[in-house]
Amino acid sequence: MSHEKRKYELKKRADDLAETHMRITEAAIELHGTVGPSRTTLSAVAQRAGVERRTLYRHFPTEADLFAACSSHYFAANPWPDLDGWRAIRDPRQRFAQALDELYAYYERNEPMLSNVLRDAEHSDLARAAVAPLNAYLVEAAGILVTSRRRLAGAAVRHSLALSTWKSLAANGVRRSDAVKLVTALVESA
C-alpha cells in the first residue's frame, strides 16, 4: 500500500470518527431539548444517531462523558448574552433594559432545553452540573445590574433574570418588549 493511500485512509477514518461523535452528541442534544436529560436513554441516543450502543460507548464511555460533550457543544452554539456589553452601558436603566431584552431573547430561543435541564437538575447530578455555569452567569449578571443597596431592589433584579419570570410573562401573552418595560418598572419601584 502506498504511503499516500494510507495517509488518505487514516484521514478518512478520523473524519468518520469525528462525524459519528458529532452525530451522537447532536442526537443527545435533540433528546435533551425535547424530553429532557433524565428521560433520555442511551438506547434512544444511539437510535437517533443511527449507531449501535457499542459505538456510542466507544465514543462516550460514561453518561457523564456524553452529558459533558452535549453541554459544551450546546452552550458553545448558544452562548449567553455578553456581560461585557452590559458593563459598558453607563446608564443603569438603559443597561438593565438592554440586559433583559437580550436575556429574554436568549430564553425565547432556548426555552425547551433550559426548562428541561433546570427541571432535571432538581434530581440529577449531571443536569445540576450542566446548569452550574448558567447559575454562575446569572449571579454575575445580577452583580452588574443591581445598582441599589436596597434589599428589595436586589431581589427584584435577581427575580427578573430567572427563566421562570420570563416564562410566566410569555405564558400570559406579554411580548418581550413589553416584558422588558414591565419588569424594568417593577425593579425601579423596589
State where each predicted segment sits.
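Basic, helix-initiating cap at the start of DNA-binding domains
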Residues: 1-51, 58, 64-65
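Alpha-helical DNA-contacting segments of helix-turn-helix folds
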Residues: 32, 65-74, 114
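Short, basic, alpha-helical segments at the C-terminal edge of helix-turn-helix-like DNA-binding modules
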Residues: 42, 71-79
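Helix-turn-helix DNA-binding motif, specifically the short coil turn and the N-cap/start of the second
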Residues: 52, 175
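Residues in the recognition helix of alpha-helical DNA-binding motifs
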Residues: 59, 69, 182
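Hydrophobic alpha-helical connector segments
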Residues: 63, 69, 80-109, 135
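Amphipathic alpha-helical packing segments from all-alpha helical-bundle domains
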Residues: 101-118, 123-155, 178-189
